[in-house]
Amino acid sequence: MQIVDAQIHLWGSGLPSNLSHRQVTAFTPEEAISLMDEGGVDAAVIHPPGWDPGSTDMAFAAVRNYPGRFAIMGAVPLDRPESRERIAGWRDQPGMLGLRYGFLADPARQWLRDGTLDWLWTTAQKAGVPIAMLATDSLREIGRIAERHPGLRLTIDHLGGRGGTSTLKDAAAMTHMPELLALAKFPNVAVKATGVPHYSSEAYPFPALHIYLRQVYDAFGPRRMFWGTDITKMPCSWGQCVTMFTEELPWLMDLDLELVMGDALCAWWGWGRTV
């Protein structure tokens, strides 16, 4: 079984602007590989963070230096006209799988709702570029986008929640769940089950969150549910993030477990890594 983390951040300078992440000035590919090997993680998808302007270059270097271990979900500036021309060849870059954006704050949140980004959905669909997003307040709007662009693969981050931007725990962090589950009717929408321990006030194996994982599994199925960590804000080890799914969820087993732990993500984002 290949174990592929759907989201990590790597950086080489600056402190994370999101205080839930480790407040260190670097988390390098070398550090990540060491911890991945220790935790039994085969590969990970890098999401270059905005607080380090060199993070995308670091991600490309990681792809080169550790073949098959890393891929990238990158970004183009949404407010620059020249960005539109870059989408067509986006996946031609080594290791680049797609695009990822946060839509929790204005102006990006407003652009999501008022049609400003219609060009993005149309262009990405035509180019076969999947998009991941953090958009807790806009799940209904994402449904409308998914319906209008059925060939565009959309992925919702962090169980649809606010990830590290929120201090809410347990049920209080999951009040959006009905709106997230409603998106399951769109076959082009998937969910990252990333960062789950961060939402828990309990110790490992974070049992209060298991009910929400089961709800996402029942609604979206194992081909549209992706394990991952966002490791630099986890209250536990990488290995425990793995075993929470592989050992503590008795309803997740066999082929479905293999899908959730990596196979489904690679298929959804088109990562043809060699196992």
Place the predicted regions along the sequence by residue.
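Catalytic pocket-lining loop regions of alpha/beta-barrel enzymes
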Residues: 110-226
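Hydrophobic faces of well-ordered beta-strands that scaffold small-molecule active sites
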Residues: 3-8, 44-47, 72-74, 97-101, ...
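Conserved, mostly hydrophobic/aromatic
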Residues: 7, 36, 59, 90, ...
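Alpha-helical scaffold segments that flank or form the walls of functional sites
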Residues: 20-47, 55-65
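Active-site gating/metal-coordination segments in enzymes
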Residues: 53-137, 144, 192-196
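Short, acidic/polar
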Residues: 25-35, 80-91, 175-176
